[in-house]
Amino acid sequence: YYQMGKDNANKELSAFDVCAEIGYKPIKGLQLSLGAELMSGTSQTDTANKVNHSFNPLYGTNHRFNGYMDYFYVGNHLNTVGLLDGYLRIHYTYKKVLFGINGHYFKAASDIRDKRKGATDKLSDNNLGGEVDFTMSYNYTDGVSIQGGYSQFFGSTGLQMLRGTSSLTPTSNWAYIMVIIRPGSVKWPKVGLKM
C-alpha cells in the first residue's frame, strides 16, 4: 500500500506498507508461516520535518497484525517511526481443536532519538522488542466455539526511548478467554482463530 497527498496537518504525505509471507503445510493439520511487514515511518532526527513518511493504517487491525498485545498501531499510530515486524506462525489443527503460537520481532523502520540525559543528538537502538502469542480454540459446534490465549511482550531500550519513559516495564503480558456464538444459519463474520 502507498499513501500520498496531504496529512491532517497539511504536510506532504509519502508512506508505504509492504508485507511478504510464505506458508508451508508439512503434514495434515500443521501450518507454518514466515513473514515480514514493513510500515514506513518518520525519523525522529529529521529536523526539516517537511514530509510525513509515517504509514497510517486508517482502520484498527486489533490483534490481526503485529502481535496480540497491540503495542503498535492501536491508539498511538500517528506520526510514528514506522515498524518492521518479522514473524513466525505455527498453527496445528486436530479434530475440533486449534493450537497456535506466533513469534514476533519488532524493529523501528526509522531513527529513534536517544532521550536519556546527556545523550544529545545520539540515536537509540531501533530494536523495539519481541512478542510470543499462544492461542487455543475449540470448535464445539458450527455456531459455538471457545478460545483462549496468553501473550508475553519483551520490551527494549529502543521502546523506552520511543515511548519517552525509562519506567516502562521490560515485560508485559495478558491472557484472555472468550466464547464465540454465531446463532442460526446466518453467515456471521469470522472472529478469533481461523479453524
Model-derived segments and their meaning:
Residues 133-162:
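C-terminal structured domain segments
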Residues 164-168:
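Short proline/glycine-enriched turn/loop segments at secondary-structure junctions
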Residues 29-32, 96-101, 142-148, 185-190:
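Repeated loop/turn-to-beta-strand initiation elements of outer-membrane beta-barrel proteins
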Residues 16-20, 84-88, 130-134, 173-179:
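Hydrophobic, lipid-facing positions within transmembrane beta-strands of outer-membrane proteins
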